[in-house]
Amino acid sequence: MAELENPSVMSKLIAFLSSLLERVAESNDLTRRVATQSQRVSVFHGLSRPTITIQSYLERIFKYANCSPSCFVVAYVYLDRFTHRQPSLPINSFNVHRLLITSVMVAAKFLDDLYYNNAYYAKVGGISTKEMNFLELDFLFGLGFELNVTPNTFNAYFSYLQKEMTLLQPLSLVVVPSSRSLITFNDDEASHQKQQQQQLAV
């Protein structure tokens, strides 16, 4: 998509995705503390919160992964699918970094003709190659190997991101109660307008 080739659009996209994921993680951290049902711990769950911010981490991935800009939109689609298929593994501050590096790597492997191997992504993400391999496998099974993103789905997610970035331009941020998911679209996009109103707006 031509707009994604624009560096200013990509820097805004990175900033917005970081902000969104940070709010989702913080919201789920609070929910986790008061939740009566236990949340499953997975390979994505770190023992402690990483010291690097989500935005710095995503900028690092963008700088070193050298994947196509579309990978970041597709990674977002994958994260959304993952959270819907794995409701007991909501995005939080203990797993968001690992989910990010894994979703971008899987998106690059699926979309791009040329991409780096797992060892390279492990270095970029600050984890071991063995851990990167486990994360990839768990992520793929968590997605049910549903990696294809139709043009309609891609455009719907990208349009949503564009709209939200435009709304945040004046950066008057309003926080509203959130649900667990990021955004919900069906591949057929038949109920796109209705679903857009039900998206996460943290």
UniProtKB/Swiss-Prot annotation:
Spell out the Gene3D superfamilies in the cross-references.
Cyclin-like
Q: Which CDD domains match?
A: CYCLIN_AtCycU-like
GO BP field: cell division
Supply the Pfam families for this chain.
Answer: Cyclin
Sorted alphabetically, the keyword list is: Cell cycle, Cell division, Cyclin
- Cite the record's tissue specificity text: Expressed in roots, stems and flowers. Expressed in the shoot apex, leaf primordia and young leaves.
Give a GO molecular function annotation for the protein. protein kinase binding
Out of the domains of life, which is the source? Answer: Eukaryota
Alphabetical list of SUPFAM superfamilies matching this protein? Cyclin-like
The UniProt subunit note reads as follows:
Interacts with CDKA-1.
What the record says about family reads: Belongs to the cyclin family. Cyclin U/P subfamily.
Q: What is this protein called?
A: Cyclin-U4-1
Which species is this record about?
Arabidopsis thaliana (Mouse-ear cress)
Q: What is the lineage of its organism?
A: Eukaryota, Viridiplantae, Streptophyta, Embryophyta, Tracheophyta
